């Protein structure tokens, strides 16, 4: 029996892949008894050959049931997504960098990692400037940009203190001088441009 517009396409298409022994209709191994922690590697993997050989027993069942791929998506929705693991090379670089830091730099690094601008405050400031509601993602991004900006100003001020031979509790004049030095580098937008026309 042929269905669809293509010839040679049988009604027995698009269902459960062949070769999934020991799995229930959702593709979950029966030996796990509902525990999805440790799936068997070989038995329940969906391979590209299996996707091409999908079969179904009857037309009514295929029309009412969602495809196998869609069932898999809904099954994994409730599970925690695993975070991608960090490369060993990246971890090695980070440990090398941290071991090369002095005590002062390490304490500053830890404080910098822990600090963050409050998202609600950033969103309210952005709303007062734009006059529109601000999406949460935009407030988070702006808070991150502000943190980087403050870090650059502080680093410039610390470099100036080191150049002048001063000790690090930064004074307001050091921060003002750092801002003045960063303006020509293009870090600050110039608000005082004259409009020619």
Swiss-Prot record:
Residues 59-88 are annotated as: Disordered. GO terms for cellular component: transcription factor TFIID complex. SUPFAM superfamilies: Histone-fold. GO terms for molecular function: protein heterodimerization activity. Expressed in fetal brain and testis. GO terms for biological process: RNA polymerase II preinitiation complex assembly. Residues 72-88 have a biased composition (Basic and acidic residues). InterPro entries: Histone-fold (IPR009072), TAF11-like (IPR045127), TAFII28_dom (IPR006809). PANTHER family: TATA-BOX BINDING PROTEIN ASSOCIATED FACTOR 11 LIKE PROTEIN 2-RELATED (PTHR13218:SF15), TRANSCRIPTION INITIATION FACTOR TFIID SUBUNIT 11-RELATED (PTHR13218). Belongs to the TAF11 family. This is TATA-box-binding protein-associated factor 11-like protein 14. The gene is TAF11L14.
């Amino acid at each position: 029996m042929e269905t669809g517009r293509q010839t040679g396409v049988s009604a027995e298409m698009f269902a459960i892949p062949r070769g999934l022994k020991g799995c229930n209709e959702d593709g979950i191994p029966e030996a796990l008894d509902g525990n999805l922690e440790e799936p068997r590697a070989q038995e329940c993997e969906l391979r590209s050959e299996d996707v091409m050989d999908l079969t179904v027993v009857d037309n009514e069942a295929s029309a009412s049931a969602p495809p196998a791929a869609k069932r898999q998506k809904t099954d994994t929705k409730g599970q925690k997504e695993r975070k991608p693991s960090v490369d060993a090379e990246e971890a090695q670089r980070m440990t090398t960098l941290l071991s090369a830091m002095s005590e002062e730099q390490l304490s500053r690094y830890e404080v910098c990692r822990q600090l963050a601008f409050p998202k609600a405050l950033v969103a309210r400031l952005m709303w007062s400037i734009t006059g529109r509601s601000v999406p949460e993602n935009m407030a988070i991004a702006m808070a991150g940009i502000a943190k980087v900006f403050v870090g650059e100003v502080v680093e410039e001020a610390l470099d100036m203190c080191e150049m002048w031979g001063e000790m690090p509790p930064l004074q307001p004049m050091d921060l003002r001088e750092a801002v003045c030095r960063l303006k020509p580098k293009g870090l600050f937008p110039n608000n005082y441009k004259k409009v020619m026309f």
